């Protein structure tokens, strides 16, 4: 089965072709970072218009790269939510039109399920069950994953996501957009322990997160350093990253203890952070745990994860293959609400 995946939930347009027999055949991505940089963040209207411009050329690109035609497509998977409503509608509209024209089934995919399953695209995918740490610009969650469509929420952020905290800290430090990678790069030059920042909810006794207080602590420090030198900024960035990593690692280890699982999957844009990976890998070796990550190319939003998640859902529950076109979008959507019929 050849599945076309379409991702358009925010500021990246991604398309991919995944074959259930041969694996990932092709993927293409257009990032809108340059367009949004002048605004310091994503402008929803501009994002939607750019998706419209990019989606069909990217479709032709992946077909050419895979040596396939539109008539070879057996099913279409698209990001149904969560995300920006206008951006989601672009992908959904293209999926509906193509599905109708080609008379092939389509399936709406939860954006976070795509991230959660993206490590399964690697050469050594994790077997079920496992704990997943989803850390991105808009979400920070710990999930227990028992199988395709069988997910249980263990904990989540009560305010800012880790990625949001990175972006807001970047602005406080006068860094560019997107903020997450800029903060991480600056932190490489920082001296550990030069600043003391809180580890919110580190000892809360549950698996929830909170990063708003950490952001406020960074703001307080920047105000004290009115004439901040570059080394001070690097030291503060290092303190911030260390605080984030400490909390993410501690909560992940607690989730593994609570569930009894020995496998941890880390996905989402923040999952590309070097310090986070090094800490988790070190603990994995010490505690005989297996830690899995997606390829770096698939940490951020992409069409490959949507094509793969759609293919897995259709294989697990063929009744999801519908030709009832006119699918809408779900800008707000809890991952735990998408159980397959067989997992209900």
Swiss-Prot record:
NCBIfam families: gcp_kae1 (TIGR00329), T6A_TsaD_YgjD (TIGR03723)
Keyword line: Acyltransferase, Cytoplasm, Iron, Metal-binding, Transferase, tRNA processing
HAMAP family reported for this sequence: TsaD
Functional note: Required for the formation of a threonylcarbamoyl group on adenosine at position 37 (t(6)A37) in tRNAs that read codons beginning with adenine. Is involved in the transfer of the threonylcarbamoyl moiety of threonylcarbamoyl-AMP (TC-AMP) to the N6 group of A37, together with TsaE and TsaB. TsaD likely plays a direct catalytic role in this reaction.
GO molecular function terms listed in the Swiss-Prot or TrEMBL record: iron ion binding; N(6)-L-threonylcarbamoyladenine synthase activity
Pfam families: TsaD
Main location: cytoplasm
Family per similarity comment: Belongs to the KAE1 / TsaD family.
The organism of origin for this protein: Cupriavidus taiwanensis (strain DSM 17343 / BCRC 17206 / CCUG 44338 / CIP 107171 / LMG 19424 / R1) (Ralstonia taiwanensis (strain LMG 19424))
Binding-site residues, substrate: 134-138, 167, 180, 273
GO cellular component, one term: cytoplasm
Gene Ontology process terms (BP): tRNA threonylcarbamoyladenosine modification
Gene3D superfamilies per the UniProt record, alphabetical: 3.30.420.40
Catalytic activity, as annotated: L-threonylcarbamoyladenylate + adenosine(37) in tRNA = N(6)-L-threonylcarbamoyladenosine(37) in tRNA + AMP + H(+)
Compartment annotation: Cytoplasm
Designated name of the protein: tRNA N6-adenosine threonylcarbamoyltransferase
This enzyme's EC code(s): 2.3.1.234
Cofactor: Fe(2+)
InterPro entries, per the entry: ATPase_NBD, Gcp-like_dom, KAE1/TsaD, TsaD
CDD domains linked: ASKHA_NBD_TsaD_bac
Enzyme class: transferase
Cofactor descriptive note: Binds 1 Fe(2+) ion per subunit.
Binding site residues for Fe cation: 111, 115, 301
């Amino acid at each position: 089965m050849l599945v076309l995946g379409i991702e358009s939930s925010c500021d990246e347009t991604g398309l991919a072709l995944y074959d259930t027999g041969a694996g990932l055949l092709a993927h293409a991505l257009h990032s809108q970072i340059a367009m949004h940089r002048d605004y310091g963040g994503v402008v929803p209207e501009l994002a939607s218009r750019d998706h419209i411009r990019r989606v069909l050329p990217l479709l032709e690109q992946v077909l050419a790269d895979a040596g396939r035609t539109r008539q070879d497509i057996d099913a279409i998977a698209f990001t149904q939510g969560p995300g920006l409503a206008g951006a989601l509608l672009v992908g959904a509209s293209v999926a509906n039109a193509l599905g109708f024209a080609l008379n092939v089934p389509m399936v709406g995919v939860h954006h976070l399920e795509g991230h959660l399953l993206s490590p399964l695209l690697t050469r050594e995918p994790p077997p079920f069950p496992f704990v997943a740490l989803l850390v991105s610009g808009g979400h920070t969650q710990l999930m227990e994953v028992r199988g395709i469509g069988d997910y249980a929420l263990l904990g989540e952020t009560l305010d800012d996501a880790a990625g949001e905290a990175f972006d807001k800290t970047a602005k406080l430090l006068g860094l560019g957009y997107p903020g997450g990678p800029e903060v991480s790069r600056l932190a490489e030059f920082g001296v550990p322990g030069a600043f003391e920042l809180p580890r919110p909810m580190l000892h809360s006794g549950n698996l929830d997160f909170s990063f708003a207080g950490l952001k406020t602590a960074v703001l307080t420090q920047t105000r004290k350093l009115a004439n901040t030198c570059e080394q001070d900024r690097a030291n503060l960035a290092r303190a911030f990253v260390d605080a984030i990593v400490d909390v993410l690692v501690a909560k992940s280890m607690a989730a593994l203890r609570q569930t009894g699982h020995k496998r941890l999957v880390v996905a989402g844009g923040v999952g590309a952070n070097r310090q986070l990976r090094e800490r988790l890998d070190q603990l994995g070796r010490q505690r005989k745990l297996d830690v899995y990550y997606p390829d770096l190319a698939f940490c951020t939003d992409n069409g490959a994860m949507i094509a793969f998640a759609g293919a897995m859902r259709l294989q697990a529950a063929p009744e999801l293959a519908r030709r009832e076109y006119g699918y809408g979008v779900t800008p707000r959507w809890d991952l735990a609400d998408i159980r397959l019929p067989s997992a209900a």
